[in-house]
């Protein structure tokens, strides 16, 4: 079958290239294209990459037996409207967008009725090895034969396959990604607004701070549209980002109004809801320790010079999970590396009473960190308002400005972050 069956990929961005490389190396014939104006440059760079570079989506659609749309969620409707009607008779079509509602709507509107629909979503970025990472496969409408073929094609990633409906995918994706991304995007925006490089300041060095910095830089070194599409086009994601902004704001107001007891009760009750009454059990499966986290630092400041931190970003995410009735550990089977790390970090704070006590004390009794927390409040509310207004233009502008501010440290942060993620997930897999 591999000699005659052709896989087509429309959209040759980072994930499109990842799919083309893995599928072609597995022996399948692969056709790829990007925007027509990019044809010559892609042909010159990747023409000998083991797959065929075609001029546009019409050629890919007419010749391929399984066509994957690897385009931004914001543009999926107009791209499928353009190329969908040209789909080969009896072919299979799918997409890789992180939000499936607009993708499925486009497929149902523009694809011929004789075309089967089987979508997928690799729950990781292009810089992560797909082996053992969650891969969602969505059988929207398909024969058993076509379903088996798609499973065989995607088996080349050696990922952990999860079968979901499009609706289930969007709900779980919101649960596992929306607030996680919002937290790290907000950190970067707040640091930028304060004109701070956190690795140069003793407020942010050692242990948990390394995860915050590395993962925030990791997100800002990626493509803006990856995060914008998931946040703006997924209704569940919008609701969760709004709740996170509310949790951040309400906790900050309690902290600065002298309501320390109310603040502490709210935090501890949220922790009990999310992680259970018995905090001795490690539900995330991540074996975190200060010694391990200290190995992955991009800061030159000695740990013993670090200062207390309120960890508002972490306490607020647990509070928002509690308010939304979310138990994050229930979604570990189809979660991203970022989400697993963030759940692990959050649980680490709550499972170490001394650390949690320090966070509460710093927020309510120690005003030195209040200006930084205020900047975080302003940043998270600005992201939330942008998402609620479905404002892609402002989202892109804020993201790219912050990205440019931190660009000099991306290479080092990516290298250190990759090593950190690999080590921590290795510990997870050993359990």
Swiss-Prot record:
Presence of keyword NADP: yes
Pathway stated in the Swiss-Prot or TrEMBL entry: Amino-acid biosynthesis; L-tyrosine biosynthesis; (4-hydroxyphenyl)pyruvate from prephenate (NADP(+) route): step 1/1
Pfam families with a match to the protein in the record: NAD_binding_2
InterPro entries in the record: 6-PGluconate_DH-like_C_sf, 6PGDH_NADP-bd, NAD(P)-bd_dom_sf, Preph/Arog_dehydrog, Prephen_DH, Prephenate_DH_fun
Recorded superkingdom: Eukaryota
A GO CC term assigned to this protein in UniProt: cytosol
GO biological process: tyrosine biosynthetic process
Annotated positions binding NADP(+): 5-34
Keyword set, alphabetical order: Amino-acid biosynthesis, Aromatic amino acid biosynthesis, Cytoplasm, NADP, Oxidoreductase, Tyrosine biosynthesis
UniProt key word NADP: yes
Gene3D superfamilies for the chain: 6-phosphogluconate dehydrogenase C-terminal like domain (1.10.3660.10), NAD(P)-binding Rossmann-like Domain (3.40.50.720)
EC number from the UniProt entry: 1.3.1.13
Reaction equation(s) it catalyzes: prephenate + NADP(+) = 3-(4-hydroxyphenyl)pyruvate + CO2 + NADPH
Domain Prephenate/arogenate dehydrogenase: 5-285
GO molecular function: NAD+ binding; NADP binding; prephenate dehydrogenase (NAD+) activity; prephenate dehydrogenase (NADP+) activity
Subcellular location: Cytoplasm
PANTHER family documented for this protein: PREPHENATE DEHYDROGENASE, PREPHENATE DEHYDROGENASE [NADP(+)]
Family to which this protein belongs: Belongs to the prephenate/arogenate dehydrogenase family.
Protein name: Probable prephenate dehydrogenase [NADP(+)]
Organism lineage string: Eukaryota, Fungi, Dikarya, Ascomycota, Taphrinomycotina
Record gene name: tyr1
């Amino acid at each position: 079958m591999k000699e005659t069956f052709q896989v087509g990929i429309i959209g040759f961005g980072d994930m499109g290239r990842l799919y083309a490389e893995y599928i072609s190396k597995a022996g399948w014939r692969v056709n790829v294209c990007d925007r027509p104006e990019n044809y010559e440059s892609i042909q010159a760079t990747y023409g000998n990459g083991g797959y065929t570079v075609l001029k546009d989506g019409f050629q890919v659609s007419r010749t391929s037996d399984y066509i994957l749309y690897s385009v931004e969620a914001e543009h999926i409707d107009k791209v499928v409207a353009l190329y969908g009607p040209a789909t080969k008779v009896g072919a299979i079509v799918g997409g890789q967008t992180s939000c499936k509602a607009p993708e499925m709507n486009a497929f149902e509107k523009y694809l011929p009725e004789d075309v089967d629909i089987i979508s997928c979503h690799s729950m990781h970025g292009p810089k992560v090895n797909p082996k053992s990472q969650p891969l969602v496969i969505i059988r929207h409408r398909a024969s058993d034969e076509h379903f088996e073929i798609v499973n065989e094609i995607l088996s080349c990633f050696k990922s952990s396959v999860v079968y979901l409906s499009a609706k289930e995918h969007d709900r779980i994706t919101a649960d596992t990604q929306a607030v996680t991304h919002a937290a790290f995007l907000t950190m970067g925006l707040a640091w930028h607004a304060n004109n701070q490089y956190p690795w140069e300041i003793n407020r942010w060095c050692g242990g948990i701070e390394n995860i915050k910095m590395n993962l925030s830089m990791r997100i800002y070194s990626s493509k803006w549209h990856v995060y914008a599409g998931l946040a703006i086009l997924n209704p569940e994601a919008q609701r969760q980002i709004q709740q996170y902004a509310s949790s951040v704001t309400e906790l900050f107001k309690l902290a600065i109004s002298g309501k320390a007891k109310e603040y502490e009760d709210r935090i501890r009750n949220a922790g009990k809801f999310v992680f259970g009454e018995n905090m001795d059990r490690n539900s995330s499966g991540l074996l975190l320790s200060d010694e391990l986290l200290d190995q992955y630092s991009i800061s030159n400041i000695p740990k013993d010079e670090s200062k207390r931190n309120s960890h508002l970003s972490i306490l607020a995410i647990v509070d928002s999970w509690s308010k939304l009735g979310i138990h994050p550990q229930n979604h570990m089977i189809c979660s991203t590396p970022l989400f697993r790390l963030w759940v692990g970090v959050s649980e680490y704070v709550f499972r170490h009473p001394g650390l949690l006590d320090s966070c509460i004390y710093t927020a309510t009794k120690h005003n030195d960190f209040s200006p930084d927390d205020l900047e975080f409040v302003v940043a998270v509310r600005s992201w939330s308002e942008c998402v609620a207004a479905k404002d892609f233009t402002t989202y892109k502008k804020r993201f790219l400005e912050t990205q440019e501010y931190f660009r000099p440290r991306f290479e080092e942060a990516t290298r250190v972050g990759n090593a950190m993620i690999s080590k921590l997930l290795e510990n997870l897999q050993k359990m």
